Amino acid sequence: MSQFDSLIIGEVAQDTNVDYDGTTVHAVGGAVYYSGFAAANTGHKTAVLPKADTAQVDLAAAFSPAPNVTVYPLHSRTSFVTKNVYHTPDRERRTSTVDSVIEPYRTEEVPDIDAAIWHLAGLAAGDIPNEMIPFAARHAMVAIDVQTMLRWVENGGMVYHDWAEKKELLPYVRFLKTDAAEAEILTGFTDRAEAARQLYQWGAKEILITHNT
């Protein structure tokens, strides 16, 4: 049996969130942060490998309220710093600006952690390089939040581009999480069932597509 159920890899974000009504909140965020809390609160033994400028962000303290989480902090000379302006109450439409990003993860800085699932939960393309996927697959089942392959920081903003290496790398992926818009970028299909079938044919074993109805 593995020491941990999940190892979640990704940078934390220093977020400024402006709601549609003008309410402004400064917070720690990011996929690793929210996924870490969610996994821990299901009872999973969870390890997280967050990355940030540790002079600015206390990574252990950020996760301290979560049960069952072991933190392996990594230092970057820069952090992921962003501002999100939400235009609708459901937060589906937003404008994001990015002040800085982390130094990319490197395979050689990943500790020897025994986990059943390695969940790659970055925030922008390049933060978790493509070579991390086959590396992770040699250690565990691989889960990916595909935003880390589609969202690019350009001119201080976030734009989406297709994942050029998707057909090469999806066969390494056991669990693929995408939203409906990201699934359309990947496959060209607006129909979620068709998109899921295409992603499965390209090699992902289990696909979760989130959406608002």
Predicted regions mapped to residue ranges:
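Short catalytic helix/loop segments, enriched in acidic residues and glycine
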Residues: 24-37
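Flexible, glycine/proline-enriched loop segments at strand-loop-helix junctions
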Residues: 115-124, 148-158
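Conserved phosphate/ATP/ADP-binding segment of small-molecule kinases
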Residues: 152-213
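Short beta-strand/turn micro-motifs composed of small residues
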Residues: 10, 50-52, 146, 211
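Active-site metal-binding loops of divalent metal-dependent hydrolases
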Residues: 10-12, 31
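Short amphipathic alpha-helical segments and helix-helix/interface helices
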Residues: 36, 60-61, 107-110, 129-134, ...
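Structural detector of well-ordered beta-strand residues that form the stable sheet scaffold
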Residues: 142-145, 208
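Conserved N-terminal subdomain of the carbohydrate kinase-like
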Residues: 3-5, 14-26, 41-121, 126, ...
